[in-house]
């Protein structure tokens, strides 16, 4: 079973994480919030653009990371969990063959529906379902397999945070107006020119 294999491969790392001072719920919220912070400078149109085959739309990244928690933790391990939209299992799978059929990677940029607002509601739906599960992990030792899957899910989302940045960097660079991501201040002075330094001996 795919979830069992994933859990076995990441159990050692999650055991260490469980000993850290930061609780599971706090870590989950921090990682998810950082994804939102990365996307904060974007406008709606930025979320859906795809400028080359190796780029995925930002909207797809933020949906896919929620799909992971839903597919490998909530659906099989939380009795009574109901997906917000069962069709998302097909749309936002990537290359997890054992998890079912998936939308063609090359056509991710064709998907304007669900909307960006729909995707944020999807993330909120998954977050609401994950909250009591993570709170229980903080209160008890919990299930080692679940801890391993949560750890993997957080690492997976952090990987996609990097992909969000690299993909949107190419997308913004491809635009004639050269928009910038965020309003970070520019350097107040130029760097000093490089030069050789001589030492005796």
Residue ranges of model-derived segments:
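N-terminal regions that are enriched for targeting/export leaders
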Residues: 2-47
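Short, contiguous alpha-helical
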Residues: 3, 45-101, 136-190, 195-197
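Amphipathic, non-membrane alpha-helical segments in soluble helical-bundle scaffolds
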Residues: 21-28, 55-62, 85, 89, ...
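Alpha-helical packing segments of well-folded alpha/beta enzyme cores
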Residues: 24-27, 31-38, 65-68, 115, ...
